[in-house]
UniProtKB/Swiss-Prot annotation:
It is an enzyme of class 3 (hydrolase). It comes from Prochlorococcus marinus (strain NATL1A). Its EC number is 3.5.1.15. This is Probable aspartoacylase. It catalyses: an N-acyl-L-aspartate + H2O = a carboxylate + L-aspartate. HAMAP family: Aspartoacylase.
């Protein structure tokens, strides 16, 4: 049986520095974080962007892990080259194959701490259920968005993204660092419990399923001509109902939520998403029954069956 190995990534975006700082301190003091004896690799996702103090150099690294893009190194694209390196080093067929990838991020939006799952892979949903049961974190299921693909964790058999905010880009914050450490240790603890078959899965999983993203108001030339309404700013995870305020213009015009069905907004006014023409994303809160297939998939993965 292969040794269980977990890839821990911080700095997938070079200006999200709290996880990077935590990893650097961890290297100095190996006892700082309890991995419960599980072999881990702590990796800075985008070291070149970190040096430059930028989110990325040529292309968003967390959109660079697309199927078929690892065939050859592209010297003209730092992030696609780095994506290939990470898969070659730590992917299923890599030099140090990891079964699970955990990618630690921060956000400028008032998201608090949450877990992001891409698609509906059984092992992902099982691990997300465990961490939600332990810490009560919301789970954002990102799917059905063809404009946003190629996420890092999708290149591993099981993978979750941890998002913590709000925090400005390039800033250290004690709360963010403490939350990152807590979630990392809890994830490792739960993986350890699965490894030892000493685990308790919840009966339900609360999901915030991605519906769509919306852009800022724009004028005829494509320039942003409105901003997030004061009643919507910093109200991530709070239900939107028809006619609630979304945006405001300087002339006093208010743009309202027009959907008949209530949605839950997330990543409201995230600074890094402006270039992606995203002002916020809408989700639908759903209560899912925990499936035995999820549990078995995670157990089989960790025990290499």
């Amino acid at each position: 049986m292969k040794q269980l190995q977990v890839l821990l990534v911080a700095g997938t975006h070079g200006n999200e520095i709290n996880g990077i700082w935590l990893f650097d301190e961890w290297k100095k003091s190996s006892f700082l974080i309890n991995t419960h004896g599980i072999k881990t690799f702590q990796v800075i996702g985008n070291p070149e962007a970190k040096k430059a103090g930028k989110r990325y150099i040529h292309h968003d690294l967390n959109r660079s892990f697309k199927e078929g893009s690892f065939i050859k190194i592209n010297p003209l694209n730092c992030e696609r080259t780095r994506a290939s390196e990470l898969v070659n080093l730590y992917g299923e067929a890599g030099e140090n194959p990891c079964q699970i990838a955990l990618d630690f991020h921060t956000t400028t939006a008032s998201m608090g701490s949450c877990i992001v799952v891409y698609g509906r892979r059984d092992a992902d949903l099982a691990l997300a259920s465990l961490i939600q049961n332990q810490l009560g974190l919301p789970v954002y299921l990102h799917e059905s968005d063809q404009k946003q693909t190629g996420f890092l964790v999708e290149s591993w058999p099981c993978g979750l993204v941890v998002e913590i905010g709000p925090i400005g880009q390039g800033l250290l914050n004690s709360r963010i660092i403490s939350q990152t450490k807590l979630i990392l240790e809890t994830l490792m603890e739960q993986i350890h419990e699965v490894k030892n078959l000493n685990l308790f899965f919840p009966n339900k999983l609360i999901i915030h399923r991605h519906i769509k993203s919306i852009d800022f108001p724009r004028d005829e030339e494509g320039n942003i001509d409105g901003y997030v309404h004061s009643l919507r700013q910093s109200k991530d995870w709070q239900e939107l109902k028809k006619n609630d305020e979304l945006f405001c213009k300087l002339n006093g015009e208010i743009i309202r939520f027009e959907e008949d069905e209530p949605y839950i907004p997330v990543f409201i006014n995230e600074a890094a998403y402006v270039e992606k023409n995203i002002a916020m994303s809408f989700t639908k809160r759903e209560l899912w029954n925990f499936k035995k297939e999820w549990k078995q998939a995670l157990i089989d993965l960790i025990h290499q069956k």
